[in-house]
Amino acid sequence: MVTNKMTAAFRNPSGKQVATDKVAEKLSSTLSWVKNTVSHTVSQMASQVASPSTSLHTTSSSTTLSTPALSPSSPSQLSPDDLELLAKLEEQNRLLETDSKSLRSVNGSRRNSGSSLVSSSSASSNLSHLEEDSWILWGRIVNEWEDVRKKKEKQVKELVHKGIPHHFRAIVWQLLCSAQSMPIKDQYSELLKMTSPCEKLIRRDIARTYPEHNFFKEKDSLGQEVLFNVMKAYSLVDREVGYCQGSAFIVGLLLMQMPEEEAFCVFVKLMQDYRLRELFKPSMAELGLCMYQFECMIQEHLPELFVHFQSQSFHTSMYASSWFLTIFLTTFPLPIATRIFDIFMSEGLEIVFRVGLALLQMNQAELMQLDMEGMLQHFQKVIPHQFDGVPDKLIQAAYQVKYNSKKMKKLEKEYTTIKTKEMEEQVEIKRLRTENRLLKQRIETLEKHKCSSNYNEDFVLQLEKELVQARLSEAESQCALKEMQDKVLDIEKRNNSLPDENNIARLQEELIAVKLREAEAIMGLKELRQQVKDLEEHWQRHLARTTGRWKDPPKKNAMNELQDELMTIRLREAETQAEIREIKQRMMEMETQNQINSNHLRRAEQEVISLQEKVQYLSAQNKGLLTQLSEAKRKQAEIECKNKEEVMAVRLREADSIAAVAELRQHIAELEIQKEEGKLQGQLNKSDSNQYIGELKDQIAELNHELRCLKGQRGFSGQPPFDGIHIVNHLIGDDESFHSSDEDFIDNSLQETGVGFPLHGKSGSMSLDPAVADGSESETEDSVLETRESNQVVQKERPPRRRESYSTTV
């Protein structure tokens, strides 16, 4: 069923219409093929229900069922026999509708025959409003397939998920796989005339394909014949694949929907574009890949079920191989399998993975409780009938499965890598087996040759040849021995010239290797000596046998002499080989020592090179560090200069500030002194000396208090009695009399503002003396001014001044 939204998306403005002209053209070819297929089935059913009032006609264009004597609107007027006959006809109509091929024929005849009351009643009961909408919708999709496929592909997929209407399935399948106009369709008739090597296999398996379906169950029926034709034609087109049993079910489903030529084209397209060709190859490599991917999906989504399958040795191929080979056609009934095949035509093998995993998810609880045989029975008997009548439930469950195409590609690469390694191992095993077989054959040949060798008349000639060869080999051995001796001497000289190695561990390892070689050489030497000893014993026995035979004929004596000489030569050859073996052993020892020394030299050279590189690296690093150090020193000097400049600037600013503060304080002191002088002069003029002295003492006490506040010191105790005022100012003209410290200068400036108390400092002193009674007011003012000038300290130098003394007595 389709929704109103999808129906509106494809509905044309003219309203409902059953089918367009293009759909009718597509259906005409299908209906022409249906008539021959259904004719014998319809005739059999017609013979069972034939009566004067009912007739069954089979024509070249359609199959028509009519009951002119019956009226569905007046059932009460019919006799019991007529009612029974009508019931049988309705039953036969239902049977025809369940047949996928007969349904198309009957519906086509109903559209062409408006006079059949049975057809009209069946059509009115089976076609609902939604089915008519589906017909209109799919008719429009088929007419405008190219535009719809490009612009509304997603909506088309959703409609396919809901199911393709039966009458449009043949056309839509051809459109989905693009099999409408294939050149191979013209070759079909020629292929049928040819002979295929797979004909016997196809004939044998045809009876097993849909054995319960009416179209294929009878031997040599039309269905089996067209199935044989399609399978034979494809086996000739693709000789590598030939014929595979599972492919017959797919072809059979196609033949239920369309004529054999169109079914052949669709099948060729499926094999080429839907991975079916790789599935049906003799190696079935693609089937192994699908099994691996499906097993990985089970392991990811259903780990508990996967573990249960592994514990029961229930392999994936035991139940899922037929799913991929037949697209569930041998698993589910045809209505459900056809729905799955609709989606397969649209989306490919993805639907097989989805449906398979959905089946396992829905049956996980039951499968977990069964053993291997029980699970096989469950897959064969229970699962196929779980969704009878509810195929939408299975489709919905399938599309709830998580399917990751990128992960499937990754699994495909992993499977390819695994198979490549297996192929390499198989090739290696095959090569080893072949080599083993050849060696066995060679051993057998040598054993046969050894057993069949006998003394004959040519033995003497053979001995002479062997004697010549032995002499030649002896001469070659002597030359080789001399060369080896020269080589040994050369190696000894080079060995003596090489420096010793102090690495004890490496020497011990090499010594062990040399001792092993020496032991092997000693064993070989012992074997040679044993051989020489055996030859000598053999020679002695031979001499013992031949001592009493001097009377033998000359020919035999000559042969004996040759044998003796040959034995002697063999003894010499054995001795020579022993010497060569010893020389080779010495040469091997020398070469070993040479190799050891070469290794030592190479390691020493490598160490020297590495040390040189390290020295170069360290020198470069040292240069870089020196450069960084010089740069750091330069930056440090610059920073120090800047700091000094900043300190000097700060000190200059501080000196200026201190000088300004001193000047201000000195100016304040001058003003206060002038004020006090004015007050003192006024009071001297108005009051007597005793009263003034008391007031003056009070003022002096206040000034002392202010001075202590300014200096943060305690007031002086024990003031001398004042009978008069004596102000003395001593000025020292030396430069040393001035303090360099700004704080001392400030303290002195503050002390100089006091009157009548001792002032301690280097620049001068001020005291109150009661004995001093003479003086004038002008002299007092001059002394104060001189005191102020003497205590002004600035940064520039002043010339030395004379010492002056002023006294004022009241």
Curated annotation (Swiss-Prot):
Expression (tissue specificity): Expressed in various cell lines (at protein level). Expressed in a wide range of tissues including brain and adrenal.
Region annotation Interaction with alpha-tubulin, gamma-tubulin, BIRC5 and FBXO5: where it falls in the sequence: 1-483
Keyword Cell cycle: yes
Molecular function in Gene Ontology: GTPase activator activity; small GTPase binding
InterPro entries in the record: Rab-GAP-TBC_dom (IPR000195), Rab-GAP_TBC_sf (IPR035969), Rab_GAP_TBC_domain (IPR050302)
Post-translational modification: Probably phosphorylated by PLK1; may be required for degradation during mitosis. Ubiquitinated. Degradation during prophase is ubiquitin-dependent.
Disease: A chromosomal aberration involving EVI5 is found is a patient with stage 4S neuroblastoma. Translocation t(1;10)(p22;q21) that forms a EVI5-TRNG10 fusion protein. TRNG10 is a probable structural transcript which is normally not translated.
Note: Depletion of EVI5 by RNAi causes cell cycle arrest and mitotic abnormalities.
Official protein name in the record: Ecotropic viral integration site 5 protein homolog
Native source organism of the sequence: Homo sapiens (Human)
